[in-house]
Amino acid sequence: MTRYIFVTGGVVSSLGKGIASASLAAILEARGLKVTLLKLDPYINVDPGTMSPFQHGEVFVTHDGAETDLDLGHYERFVRTTMTRNNNFTTGRVYEDVLRRERRGDYLGATIQVIPHITDEIKRRIIKGAGNADVAMVEIGGTVGDIESQPFLEAIRQLRLEVGAKRAMLIHLTLVPYIATAGETKTKPTQHSVKELRSIGLQPDVLICRSDHPIDISSRRKIALFTNVEERAVIALEDVDTIYKIPSVLHAQGLDDIVVERFGLACGSADLSEWERVVDAKLHPEKEVTIAMVGKYMELLDAYKSLIEAMGHAGIQNRTRVNLRYIDSEDIENQGTALLEGADAILVPGGFGLRGVEGKIAAVRYARENKVPYLGICLGMQVAVIEYARDVLGWADANSTEFDKSCGHPVVGLITEWQDATGATEVRSESSDLGGTMRLGAQECQLEANSQVRQCYGKDEVVERHRHRYEVNNNLLPHLIEAGLKVTGRSGDGALVEVIEVADHPWFVACQFHPEFTSTPRDGHPLFSGFVNAALAQKARKA
């Protein structure tokens, strides 16, 4: 019988509801409970797949091919549960399904309203997403008081009532600001945020109070008094030097005990030794490398959230401080590759569209010609193929049809036919919808023996997640191979290029998939660990 923990936020956005939820879930998992997490997004987009990275940040791809909120990446990094398309839904998705049923006649001519039809659909999706977990954390996006969040808050109010107090509780994150001129923290914003919640029938059971300064006992007592929350359930969460400390911070204040007692769960004590090891390795590195990351969304680094975290995980696994030097690919176009000098390795991540592509291609050429370790991901592989065709084969007009549909040598092109998650053949074209029409989710990849990528993974077959609609053109591939390009990874059926390497180079690997989506702080990821080791070797060669 699943218990539900609803998580809301107040005062301001971006308080870290996702990380707080994932951290509590990690503690409960460490106590032997089966946990899952859901993210409910109030925006009207059906999913974040076509949203600008500058507005939304990263689109996290699940194993089953859903394009979801980046918080699901936090969830998978903190718990062992694999998220699916059922772990994230939006207002747009809810309305789309309700309207489809209305058109089909499922409501028998009823007037479709927010209550009960929209709220019932939200509740149905929460219950479905929770599955058979012991505890389901349900994070409501946005801030209490936002008009967009109201149907979700009403739905969880109803669900709390329906399942009963022994199976549902509410955690509310708020901000306790520090006023420097007064020299004290202020509790009034938290009081008003809880007042807003209570006005719609929701009484928090726990408050997690975010602050950049310590919150003293008297302030916590004051918050408890004015919000009708137990004093021990007012949890102080100050800024920390690594997010992987947060499970220990919450555990030290007894948050998991409050949950277990409330739900009457029989479970063991929490063993957080894995997290202590992660934090120790993160904060006490023995080595250091600098890696140039050449991207096109550098104004909002959340666009590369999983990738940045994955590089940190590789540092943890190698006891190495990984300093990422963020370089906008357009700056390389304007200022040249001198921006890359001094880097121990070069990383080119994915992206869409023509802007900044020539800067990425220049970064690839610099890495290849100067024997600097290189890792390309998704577009980072495609630009590596383009660079090789131009500068090794001499095809000056080589390009991707994404950027130049009439180029003379389209070494990367739109794949027009493949199988969807059900095994059915799906045909697509340039005129297909942009949303939900990519090669998405986990796919098998066969690795070549004696390759750098095979050495990293230590096995012949891997499963990695994809998010792209362009592939290496098989018609021109033989020319690339003849010129020395090595194809060291192919799709399970052998039809598509998944990994390339360059001969006579210390470490040059580019992959079509996104390995960052499966990297975790406790386990790391073999490809990123191999990349950091290559950067360490490069640094030693330069010394």
Curated annotation (Swiss-Prot):
Q: What is its EC number?
A: 6.3.4.2
Entry keyword annotation includes Repeat = no
Indicate which residues the UniProt annotation says bind Mg(2+).
Answer: 71, 139
Q: How is its activity regulated?
A: Allosterically activated by GTP, when glutamine is the substrate; GTP has no effect on the reaction when ammonia is the substrate. The allosteric effector GTP functions by stabilizing the protein conformation that binds the tetrahedral intermediate(s) formed during glutamine hydrolysis. Inhibited by the product CTP, via allosteric rather than competitive inhibition.
Q: Which UniProt keywords apply?
A: ATP-binding, Glutamine amidotransferase, Ligase, Magnesium, Metal-binding, Nucleotide-binding, Pyrimidine biosynthesis
Record-level GO cellular component terms: cytosol
Binding-site positions, UTP = 13, 186-191, 222
Domain Glutamine amidotransferase type-1, which positions? 290-541
Cited CDD domains: CTPS_N (cd03113), GATase1_CTP_Synthase (cd01746)
Residues binding L-glutamine are 351, 379-382, 402, 469
Kindly state a single biological-process term from the GO annotations of this entry. Answer: pyrimidine nucleobase biosynthetic process
> What does the record give as its pathway?
Pyrimidine metabolism; CTP biosynthesis via de novo pathway; CTP from UDP: step 2/2
Which annotated residues bind CTP? 13, 146-148, 186-191, 222
Q: Which one of the record's GO molecular function terms can you name?
A: metal ion binding
Pfam families, alphabetized: CTP_synth_N, GATase
Catalyzes what? UTP + L-glutamine + ATP + H2O = CTP + L-glutamate + ADP + phosphate + 2 H(+); L-glutamine + H2O = L-glutamate + NH4(+); UTP + NH4(+) + ATP = CTP + ADP + phosphate + 2 H(+)
> PROSITE patterns, alphabetically?
GATASE_TYPE_1
The segments labelled Amidoligase domain in the record are: 1-265
List the active site.
Answer: 378 (nucleophile), 514, 516
Query: Any further remarks?
Result: CTPSs have evolved a hybrid strategy for distinguishing between UTP and CTP. The overlapping regions of the product feedback inhibitory and substrate sites recognize a common feature in both compounds, the triphosphate moiety. To differentiate isosteric substrate and product pyrimidine rings, an additional pocket far from the expected kinase/ligase catalytic site, specifically recognizes the cytosine and ribose portions of the product inhibitor.
What does this chain do?
Catalyzes the ATP-dependent amination of UTP to CTP with either L-glutamine or ammonia as the source of nitrogen. Regulates intracellular CTP levels through interactions with the four ribonucleotide triphosphates.
The record's note on quaternary structure and interaction partners says: Homotetramer.
Q: Which family does it belong to?
A: Belongs to the CTP synthase family.
PANTHER family per the UniProt record, alphabetical = CTP SYNTHASE, CTP SYNTHASE-RELATED
Q: What is this protein called?
A: CTP synthase
